[in-house]
Amino acid sequence: MKTIQPWLGLVARLVLGGTLIAAGYLKFDELDKSQIAVRAYEMLPISLANFLGIVVPFFELAVGILLVIGAGVRITGALSALLMIGFMIAISQAWARGLSIDCGCFGGGGQVPEGEANYLTPLLRDTGLALLGVYLTLFPHTKFGLDKTPAPATQLGESNNG
C-alpha cells in the first residue's frame, strides 16, 4: 500500500483540484449568477448569501490550484472536504424542503421549473469529492507535489534530514 498510496494521492489531488478549478472558473465570469444560486437555497440572510456567492468561486479556484500543484495538501484536502460537506447540507435541505433549484455547482443556478431539479447526482458527486478530501487529509504525501515528503527514519526518532 505504501508504494501505491502516493499515486492514489496524486489522482485524488488532480480530480478534486481539477473539479474545484472548473467549478470556480465557470462561476467566476458571472458572479451575479453565483449570488442568485446561493440565494436560491433560502438558507442565509441575503447579504451573507451574496457575499458567499462572490467568495466561493475565488475559494474554489485557490484551493483547486493548491491541490493540483500539491501545496498544503493536508489543509487543502480538509478544506475541500468541509466545503463539499457544506454543499451537501445545502443541497439536502433544498431537496427536503421541496425547493426546485439548480445547485449552481458549475455556474448557473437559481430557480428551475417544477420537476427539473436534480439533487441526487450533485449529492453523490459531492460525497465522492468529500471522500477524496478526507483521503488527502489522512495521506497528504503524494507524487509530484510541492509538499516535502518526510525522509524515512534511520533510527528511532531520527531522520535523514540532518
Per-segment meaning from a language model:
Residues 1-29, 69-162:
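Extended, low-polarity transmembrane helix blocks
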Residues 6-10, 35-38, 61-62:
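Short hydrophobic/aromatic-rich motifs at helix boundaries and adjacent loops
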Residues 23-56:
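Solvent-exposed, well-ordered loop and adjacent helix/strand elements within mature globular domains
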Residues 48, 60, 153-155:
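A generic alpha-helix propensity feature with a strong bias for hydrophobic helices
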Residues 51-69:
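Hydrophobic alpha-helical transmembrane segments
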